[in-house]
Amino acid sequence: MPATSFYADAAYNTQKSRQALDPDIAIDDSDLSVDEIQELEIAAADPATFGASANRRSTDLVRLYLQEIGRVRLLGRDEEVSEAQKVQRYLKLRIVLANAVKQGDEVATPYLHLIEVQERLASELGHRPSLERWAATAGINLCDLKPILSEGKRRWAEIAKMTVEELEKMQSQGLQSKEHMIKANLRLVVSVAKKYQNRGLELLDLVQEGTLGLERAVEKFDPTKGYRFSTYAYWWIRQGITRAIATSSRTIRLPVHITEKLNKIKKAQRKIAQEKGRTPTLEDLAIELDMTPTQVREVLLRVPRSVSLETKVGKDKDTELGELLETDGVTPEEMLMRESLQRDLQHLLADLTSRERDVILMRFGLADGHPYSLAEIGRALDLSRERVRQIESKALQKLRQPKRRNLIRDYLESLS
């Protein structure tokens, strides 16, 4: 059963498209009504709707999962509004904390860093991490963990102009409401995932990716708009699934943002070819996509052409290409990803101050491949260990802004 995190970062990139990545992958279900979506939710709870071709073990897992999510009843309209309001109140508190960090608050900065580390670990593990693992991942001593959390929460309450008790109550209500909304809509995730079976991912993998989309929908849903949550969540669920399919469908995996641009170019090529009866030029594509010809060319150049390892080479065509390639070292896929990542890292780090850039390069081994400890960096730059940690935290906060963070996250997911 897919693990679901209820502690993910609230600051998602609001400019991500709700459209499917590839018209060849997408299903034309854009006209589904609210009633039809709710019917899908109910139908998804019936194990009989799954084909008999799946192996028994997989079918049993699916049946157990459906039975578990079927125990959670669907939310009524008023319940959706009430739960969503609690989630939004909590997320507004998170924005208050994030703004304080942006302004350089020395107490709020390490506190927010710890919270983000905990949420990331919870997402990866499927449960909250131990204090030891939490502290180690955050790069601090275990004895410093509780003081930072205690002081940080007091500072957060002070900034939000409320008591610590009021803050904790609102935080608890927000997280519980978020979890409730996710669990109550998992049947919708299954119903959407079923439409994308036999495309390279198992059903439960599709459900897991769709659940991540559902989580984003919960955080972004505005109950004052007047529409049902299932209508809004459907698009986020679908996007999560289609992005996963697009990522896994390539022999050489490209960053998702490159895949999205490539799919837009393909769609524009088909449209222009149909309208003008000829192969579109770079200029045609640039006009259609509101890009420059250079930008279109750069996207196309990042897409490698596949060559079969069984291709016959040599004068007598008696040798296969695969026999001439070394098996050790960096693979072509890794080389492509690292070169592309290096180019974008240079642009990313250009926004930092020179000292912040030096700390990040040394801390993560981006310059020479050797990561340095805070103490080692402090000795090299003639700074205290605590000052290095503060500089690192401030630099990472800049790099975590959605427009930058999501770009690098795509690369890291592909490299891993």
From Swiss-Prot:
Gene3D superfamilies: RNA Polymerase Primary Sigma Factor, Winged helix-like DNA-binding domain superfamily/Winged helix DNA-binding domain. It comes from the Bacteria. This is RNA polymerase sigma-C factor. Keywords: DNA-binding, Sigma factor, Transcription, Transcription regulation. One of its GO terms (molecular function) is sigma factor activity. Residues 374-393 bind DNA. Pfam families: Sigma70_r1_2, Sigma70_r2, Sigma70_r3, Sigma70_r4. GO terms for biological process: DNA-templated transcription initiation. NCBIfam families: PRK07598.1 (NF005785), Sig70-cyanoRpoD (TIGR02997), sigma70-ECF (TIGR02937). Sigma factors are initiation factors that promote the attachment of RNA polymerase to specific initiation sites and are then released. SUPFAM superfamilies: Sigma2 domain of RNA polymerase sigma factors, Sigma3 and sigma4 domains of RNA polymerase sigma factors.
